[in-house]
């Protein structure tokens, strides 16, 4: 095994789900959702939260204001960053809202200077210096983002960094705005910048246009970057930026450091998936449904003997669990293990017969536990009773009386022990309740408690068979 690498600097995360992430086409967060996401990011230990651009719209302003209020009350621990153009009014809004830091961005490549800013290099330097100084005069910390830095003239980039340092910025974000960096170049870039400007700390903001965002932020950290920009689920303009869950896992594996609470990554990723409306593909690293699911018979046999054969870290590291698929690729080890889990004892001959039936139906995508039991019963001629499930999770659909205010029912259901999440929904039912129970007896008690709530007309319970 290759030895773990060591970073020379301490590295932290700036998560930009609320700013960069909301720039994903079709994504809009409500004010309440912004606050909930910010609290979740703080809870997992994100060092900085880029809460948005307060001058863009009243709802973003209000969301950032509420997030900052929670910071002042000690509920949120992360540093709160407000995004800003190099415009005095934007800076005034960021200062007025009392953000911990104002992040001023300005495109510094010749393409940006000409096509977007309609200015010259010298005029841009004067404008940048003026706005950074103006922000600093308001008593806030200042980060300057060199937008499109990786396509800018390098000597001009150095001039820009010197200018913003002299004007009072203590951090500079190097933005690979169109995702054209590659890792070895990234490492060299940050090594050079950190050696030239030891009094400045550098961020890396890497877009994923060529699929190298995660590799580039790791290389930047090796080169001396102290803050890595991420979004949950890799949201952002076009194809997004480095995903928080993948960056955190890579830092753990390659450098042995935990920048956030890894066990809570799936939970916050699901929260953003729900609020953004952007579903993760099942094969997404770390938090995708298939991230720790094995299929090929040789793979499953190896994992059953020693999970390290096909897992770089245990899924429990990330609050996940491993599983495997039963289909035509399955071997005897997997079939035997699945029946052992169900508490059903079969002879070797019976397992071989079940496996033969599985392989004789090559177009079946996967076999559920109930399907396997039916196959086993057809082989053995016996009625098989699986072990009663433990640690049951279920979804309970609730229909309310027509003359009842649904929210009043929801508020009572939330208070029932064992209820984990309550959602008001459209369709034949009014409320969806996610519950967790240690056994079937406790589940029945929860169901009866829900049915006893005034205004509940009927319920329908569905057991959660598998959680990826």
Curated annotation (Swiss-Prot):
Keyword Magnesium belongs to the record: yes
Molecular function via GO: 2-isopropylmalate synthase activity; homocitrate synthase activity; metal ion binding
UniProt cofactor(s): Mg(2+); Mn(2+)
InterPro entries the UniProt entry points to: 2-IPM_HCS-like, AIPM/Hcit_synth_CS, Aldolase_TIM, Dimeric_a/b-barrel, Homocitrate_synth, LeuA/HCS_post-cat, PYR_CT, Tscrpt_reg_AsnC/Lrp_C
Knockout or disruption consequences: Cells lacking this gene do not grow in MM without or even with lysine, but grow in MM with the simultaneous supplementation of lysine and arginine to the medium. Furthermore, the mutant strain does not grow on MM supplemented with lysine and glutamate, but grows with lysine and ornithine.
Cross-referenced Pfam families: AsnC_trans_reg, HCS_D2, HMGL-like
Active site, per annotation: 299
Modulation of this protein's activity: Inhibited by lysine.
List of residues binding 2-oxoglutarate: 19, 83, 143, 177
Binding, Mg(2+): 20, 205, 207
Pathways per UniProt: Amino-acid biosynthesis; L-lysine biosynthesis via AAA pathway; L-alpha-aminoadipate from 2-oxoglutarate: step 1/5
Catalytic activities: acetyl-CoA + 2-oxoglutarate + H2O = (2R)-homocitrate + CoA + H(+)
Keyword list, A-Z: Acyltransferase, Allosteric enzyme, Amino-acid biosynthesis, Lysine biosynthesis, Magnesium, Manganese, Metal-binding, Transferase
Residue stretches making up the Pyruvate carboxyltransferase domain: 11-266
GO biological process: L-leucine biosynthetic process; lysine biosynthetic process via aminoadipic acid
Annotated EC: 2.3.3.14
Enzyme class: transferase
UniProt KW Transmembrane keyword: no
Protein purpose: Catalyzes the aldol-type condensation of 2-oxoglutarate with acetyl-CoA to yield homocitrate. Carries out the first step of the alpha-aminoadipate (AAA) lysine biosynthesis pathway. Does not display 2-isopropylmalate synthase and citramalate synthase activities since it cannot use 2-oxoisovalerate or pyruvate as substrate.
PANTHER family given in the database record: HOMOCITRATE SYNTHASE, HOMOCITRATE SYNTHASE-RELATED
Family note: Belongs to the alpha-IPM synthase/homocitrate synthase family. Homocitrate synthase LYS20/LYS21 subfamily.
Domain notes: Contains an N-terminal catalytic domain fused with a RAM (Regulation of Amino acid Metabolism) domain at the C-terminus. The mutant enzyme lacking the RAM domain is insensitive to inhibition by lysine, indicating that the RAM domain is responsible for enzyme allosteric regulation.
Protein name (database record): Homocitrate synthase
Organism annotation: Sulfolobus acidocaldarius (strain ATCC 33909 / DSM 639 / JCM 8929 / NBRC 15157 / NCIMB 11770)
């Amino acid at each position: 095994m290759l030895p773990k690498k060591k970073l020379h600097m301490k590295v932290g995360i700036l998560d930009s789900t609320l700013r960069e992430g909301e720039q994903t086409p079709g994504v809009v967060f409500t004010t309440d959702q912004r606050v909930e996401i910010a609290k979740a990011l703080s809870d997992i230990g994100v060092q900085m939260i880029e809460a948005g651009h307060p001058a863009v719209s009243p709802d973003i302003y209000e969301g950032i204001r509420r997030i900052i209020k929670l910071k002042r009350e000690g509920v949120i621990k992360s540093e709160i960053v407000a995004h800003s153009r190099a415009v005095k009014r934007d800076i005034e809004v960021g200062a007025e809202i009392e953000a911990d830091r104002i992040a001023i961005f300005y495109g510094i490549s010749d393409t940006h200077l000409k096509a977007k800013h309609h200015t010259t290099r010298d005029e841009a330097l004067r404008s940048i210096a003026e706005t950074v100084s103006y922000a600093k005069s308001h008593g806030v910390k200042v980060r300057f983002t060199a937008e499109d830095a990786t396509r800018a003239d390098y000597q001009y980039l150095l001039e820009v960094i010197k200018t913003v340092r002299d004007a009072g910025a203590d951090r500079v974000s190097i933005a690979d705005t169109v995702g054209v960096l590659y890792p070895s170049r990234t490492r060299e870039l940050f090594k050079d910048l950190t050696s030239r400007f030891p009094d400045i700390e550098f961020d890396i903001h890497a877009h994923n246009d060529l699929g190298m965002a995660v590799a580039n932020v790791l290389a930047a950290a090796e080169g001396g970057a102290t803050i890595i920009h991420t979004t949950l689920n890799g949201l952002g303009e076009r194809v997004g930026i480095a995903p928080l869950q993948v960056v955190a896992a890579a830092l753990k594996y390659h450098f042995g450091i935990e920048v956030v609470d890894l066990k809570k990554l799936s939970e916050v990723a699901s929260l953003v998936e729900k609020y953004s409306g952007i579903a993760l593909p099942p094969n997404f690293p770390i938090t995708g449904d298939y991230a720790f699911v094995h299929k090929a018979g040789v793979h499953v046999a190896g994992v059953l003997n020693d999970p390290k054969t096909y897992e770089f870290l245990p899924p429990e590291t990330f609050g996940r669990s491993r599983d495997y698929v039963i289909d035509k690729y399955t071997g005897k080890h997997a079939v035997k293990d699945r029946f052992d889990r169900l508490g059903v004892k079969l002879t070797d001959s019976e397992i071989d017969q079940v496996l033969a039936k599985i392989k004789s139906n090559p177009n079946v995508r996967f076999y559920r536990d109930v399907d396997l039991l039916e196959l086993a019963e057809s082989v053995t001629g016996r009625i098989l009773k699986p072990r009663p499930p433990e640690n049951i999770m279920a979804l309970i659909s609730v229909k309310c009386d027509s003359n009842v205010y649904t929210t009043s029912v929801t508020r009572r259901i939330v208070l029932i022990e064992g209820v984990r999440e309550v959602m008001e929904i459209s369709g034949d039912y009014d409320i969806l309740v996610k519950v967790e129970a240690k056994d079937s007896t406790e589940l029945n008690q929860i169901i009866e408690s829900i049915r006893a709530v005034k205004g509940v007309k009927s319920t329908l319970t569905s057991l959660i068979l598998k959680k990826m």
